[in-house]
Regions:
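Acidic, glycine-rich A-domain
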Residues: 1-221
Length: 221
């Protein structure tokens, strides 16, 4: 609230000043509007993606970014992730697009199949990074694009599934809705084992359309 204004809502606490000829009896209220949705697109860049599958995922991610870039209702972050690329036990995060990253519009063209994937670590890292950049208290949607299961050094099978599931639950406690969009080698068992919300896309070339439909459904546009 801004007080002592000549226009706006009457500030009842100032009415006693009327006999004194005071005219700044109003207050103005400034409301900061949140954007209705924070969207994070998290793209698997593991080696299993290969050339063809990675190209489909990259083109789909670029199509999504271009479709949402100028939407005033949405804040968009795009991250790629890999693991153990050079140093065992590490998770690599690559930022391809964000509200604060406006100087590299072509960065997503550099998405490629790299090494392994620690999905749980990547999900938590995305949540924490966006928390630093967004003061949005509205809806938060993370879409995880993956062609398979989490797999890295000492991070395979049930151990990896359990850890990733815990990380999904953690993200949900931070206000995020998480949806996996599986394609290529992703299986119903692994998706169902880790995520409460998931879909499988048979044709990877339609990833962009599939994810855009999910986002439109969430924000009801």
């Amino acid at each position: 609230n801004i007080y002592n204004q000549k226009r706006g809502m009457i500030n009842k606490r100032q009415l006693h000043k009327i006999p004194m000829g005071m005219t700044d009896l109003f207050k103005a209220t400034i409301v900061k509007e949140d954007k209705p949705l924070d969207v994070c697109l998290l793209v698997d860049e593991s080696g299993s993606m290969g050339h063809y599958t990675m190209r489909q995922a990259r083109e789909g991610a670029i199509a999504i970014k271009e479709a949402l870039h100028d939407n005033a209702m949405i804040n968009l972050w795009v991250y790629g992730h890999s693991a153990d690329d050079g140093v065992r036990g590490t998770t690599e995060m690559i930022e391809y697009s964000s509200p604060s990253m406006q100087d590299r519009p072509m960065a997503m063209g550099g998405m490629k199949a790299r090494c392994e994937n620690r999905d749980g670590n990547a999900i938590v890292a995305s949540v924490q990074r966006i928390k630093q950049e967004s003061d949005n208290n509205a809806h938060k949607l993370m879409i995880v694009l993956s062609d398979g299961a989490p797999s890295a050094d000492c991070y395979r099978g049930e151990v990896a599934y359990d850890h990733t599931k815990k990380c999904v639950k953690y993200a949900e406690t931070q206000g995020w809705s998480i949806i996996q969009v599986g394609f290529s080698g992703a299986t119903k068992y692994t998706m169902e084992r880790i995520f409460d919300n998931w879909i499988y896309v048979d044709d990877a070339s339609t990833l962009g359309d599939s994810v855009s439909k999910i986002i439109r459904k969430v924000i009801k546009i």
